[in-house]
A protein has these predicted regions:
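Nucleotide/phosphate-binding catalytic cleft detector across ATP-hydrolyzing
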Residues: 1-26, 32-37, 45-194
Length: 194
């Protein structure tokens, strides 16, 4: 299968601070020492992925909109929220919204609920592109900011998206080709008009 680097497969993360009315753009990237200590998280990892020290690894804990490494995703989000929202008070950050653009099954959704609770959300609201009552053509950023009108206690939101969805398409097609080969369906795959 074609080799993909972590920055091609990683989700783009947007953190919305409803208190300051500011949005921060991040990447689902982490760099760890082989001892398990996290060195960096987010956008600052992008430039380092090609020049990693010998004792460290870089990867994405959220791939194709799904949590692929729960423990690392928790550490990464905790660091990002602390960076942008400050340290959580005793009761945590308050109510948080998770907005995911990919279609998720129940188990994948639960992973996001648990993640937000673990990083300090007191309550969690889940939303995706199936939100009802949104006028067609409304930018998703406006929808997420507007959620504060419905959920008055929202303190922050985390949006999981992909700015370059072509990377996801290339990866998904490469995986499909690999699976067809494994299943002995290469001839059928070649007949598909992809």
């Amino acid at each position: 299968m074609e080799k993909f680097n972590p920055s091609e497969l990683c989700a783009d993360i947007k953190i919305y601070d409803y208190k300051k009315k500011v949005k921060y753009d991040e990447k689902s990237l982490v760099i760890f020492e082989k001892t398990g200590k996290m060195i960096k998280a987010g956008k600052e990892c992008e430039g380092m992925l090609y020049t990693l020290p010998a004792n460290s690894i870089g990867f994405s804990p959220i791939v194709l909109g799904r949590v692929s490494d729960y423990t690392c995703a928790e550490k990464m989000l905790k660091q990002m929220l602390c960076r942008y929202l400050g340290k959580p008070v005793f009761a945590g950050y308050g109510e948080g919204l998770i907005f995911v653009h990919e279609k998720l099954n129940e188990v994948e959704m639960k992973a996001y609920f648990d993640l937000l609770y673990q990083v300090g959300a007191k309550n969690v609201v889940y939303a995706d592109e199936s939100v009802k009552g949104i006028p067609e053509g409304t930018p998703w950023e406006d929808v997420i900011w507007g959620m504060k009108n419905t959920y008055k206690n929202l303190r922050f939101a985390v949006e999981i998206t992909k700015e370059q969805p072509m990377d996801y398409l290339r990866y998904s097609l490469a995986q499909l080709a690999e699976n067809c080969k494994r299943w002995g369906l290469e001839e059928e795959m070649s007949k598909l008009h992809i």
